[in-house]
Amino acid sequence: MKKAFRVLFSFLLLLASLGVFISNKVMFLKKKDDEEIFNRETEAGHLVPDEYDALPKREVTIPSSFGYALKAVLVEPHDTNRYIIIAHGVTQSKTNSVKYMNLFLNRGFNAVIYDHRRHGESGGKTTSYGYYEKFDLQSVVNWLRKEKGPDLLLGIHGESMGAATLLLYAGMLEDGADFYVADCPFSDFSEQLAYRIKEEVKLLPPKLLLPVANLFVRIRDKYSLSEVSPIAVIENIKNPILFIHSRMDDFILPSMTEALFEQKQGPKKLFMAENGLHAQSYSQNRDQYEKVLDEFLEEYVFAGDGIVAAD
């Protein structure tokens, strides 16, 4: 009897230890150093410091509904009501968003780039892969509309976690932008976490570890993994979405974006890039990326509003 109790106790202790370990990985995933991001982006030609410094812009602080500050940059080289909000991926910062910002500046948009909670200069203690981040995105949208007025042509571009965040925002809170660009999102966080566990934690099966991880995330960060599921809410998004993914992505599988595209009703477009790994669709397929973006904007955004594209 005592031996059976010891075995049970040891097993429960192991599960608890794994629960703490995995929930720590989820909530406190190691972020990339700001200098590392800056150097990578400048070396790739995505960010030219002199050109960025010359842009008319101002740093702004946007209050999150959870009590911390979201640090953002409002970039306004154009006299226009067109604005794009850029949401970066997990472990990154708004510096990573500059390359996407430039795409839209070149197409006549002004832009807001911002740091997610617990990233860059923003506050917040944990990363939730879109659960809390969707409310922060709503705060950014509300701030921009209050600052510039309600009559905006507004788009949101997101990469990886940022893409999942914009889909959760649009599908769960409000379809508050005129269009969206979702670059390499996951379709369901539980499935994504199970896949990463299978790839990285080979000792125990995901079916055993996922419920433990979910329990500890619920206890420690007050949400369930099942509540971070863009595919469960994609049907609520009526405005146009451009879905983008690299066929070679082995971190978030391209089949997730394909499933989101199939589930989305109404105006949509899909670009499966031939080159690059995760979040490299633009850097490894620049000409095609820009061509597809232009086609999407012409077909679903500018044409619908009688707007002529900027030269």
Residue ranges: model-predicted function:
Residues 168-223:
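Hydrolase active-site cap/lid region
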Residues 148-160:
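Alpha/beta-hydrolase fold nucleophile elbow
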Residues 284-311:
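Catalytic active-site module of serine/aspartate enzymes centered on a nucleophile-bearing elbow/loop
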Residues 101-123:
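Conserved alpha/beta-hydrolase
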Residues 236-238, 243-245, 249:
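Short beta-strand/loop motif that positions the catalytic acidic residue
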